[in-house]
Amino acid sequence: ITGADGRLATVVHPTAYVSPTASIEKGVVVLPKAVINTDVTVKRGCIINLGAIVDHGCVIEQGCHICLGAIVKGENRIAALSKIEAGEVVQLRQCHVNK
């Protein structure tokens, strides 16, 4: 999402929870009831969809889509441009590759 000045906007729905220790880069969209927990990093251009949960210490690399209701358990790194499908659960310390 870009503003009139061409800069990337970050959008967080009011019903989403983003921990104060999380880092959200520009161009990220966090949809209703999504949760981004402690010490998570979400890089540029990601979508954290409805009800998705990204747990403590995760890194979501650039351009990822964490789909509806997906859960990324703690300490995972999701590779750039990956899509975590609706309802999918990414287990502890699993490195996820693009798909």
Q: How would you name each of these model-derived features?
A:
Residues 1-14:
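Terminal amphipathic alpha-helical/low-complexity segments used for targeting or macromolecular assembly
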Residues 11-99:
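Structural signal for interior beta-strand "rungs" in well-ordered beta-sheet cores
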